[in-house]
Amino acid sequence: MKIKPLKDRVVVKFSSEELEKTPGGIYVPDVAKEKPQKGTVVEIGSEVKEVKVGDTVLFDKYAGSKIKVDDVEYLIIKEEEILGIVEK
């Protein structure tokens, strides 16, 4: 299934983060972590001007609406909620 965002919306795929390990050797499960704040743009709406598909972007941990499609988590956010683009 493909998600096509409308107007100024952007679909972001969460970055895959490795399982975090504490200094004491305890692995922290995903449910105990905060929402990721970095992801890759996979689709953009017709009014999006600043980002393009493939960009890695930063966003606030409470931005947008989280959805799950085919066991993959995505975030649909407004372009204005994107804090910055990570340049390589």
Curated annotation (Swiss-Prot):
Keywords: Chaperone, Cytoplasm. One of its GO terms (biological process) is chaperone cofactor-dependent protein refolding. It comes from the Bacteria. The keyword Cell membrane does not apply. CDD domains: cpn10. It is found in: Cytoplasm. One of its GO terms (molecular function) is metal ion binding. Its main location: cytoplasm. GO terms for cellular component: cytoplasm. Heptamer of 7 subunits arranged in a ring. Interacts with the chaperonin GroEL. Belongs to the GroES chaperonin family. Together with the chaperonin GroEL, plays an essential role in assisting protein folding. The GroEL-GroES system forms a nano-cage that allows encapsulation of the non-native substrate proteins and provides a physical environment optimized to promote and accelerate protein folding. GroES binds to the apical surface of the GroEL ring, thereby capping the opening of the GroEL channel. This is Co-chaperonin GroES. It comes from Thermodesulfovibrio yellowstonii (strain ATCC 51303 / DSM 11347 / YP87).
